[in-house]
């Protein structure tokens, strides 16, 4: 479980990640965000069918749920990494056939994760991640 903050811009971070990380980091970010929602809005998370709590006490997971701005940074990073994943891998194998890559499978919860920002604590001090 990691979040590589190598820039302040989520799009720049995604572009700089190596191929191995771009393939797995979308899922890791999804796990952190899903955990944040499960902690702050368990009923919403259950209705949306979000992933179960994972790595609840990991520093990156704690950071994501501390406030709505941190949470939205994670949402933007997840989207940027997925966009980069699709750009690098426009085709993928499914059932033995090459098909158009429409995104990482963990993106199926993305809209619910965006909507869940309203359940995150609203504090005025964004804890800027430092590269």
Model-assigned labels for residue ranges:
Residues 1-49, 59, 96:
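Phosphate/adenylate-binding glycine loop and adjacent helical scaffold
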Residues 36, 74-131:
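Catalytic cores of phosphodiester-bond-cleaving enzymes
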Residues 52-53, 70-73:
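Secondary-structure capping and boundary motifs in well-ordered enzyme cores
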Residues 54-62:
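Histidine-centered catalytic micro-motifs
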Residues 63-68:
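Short active-site loop/helix that positions an aromatic residue
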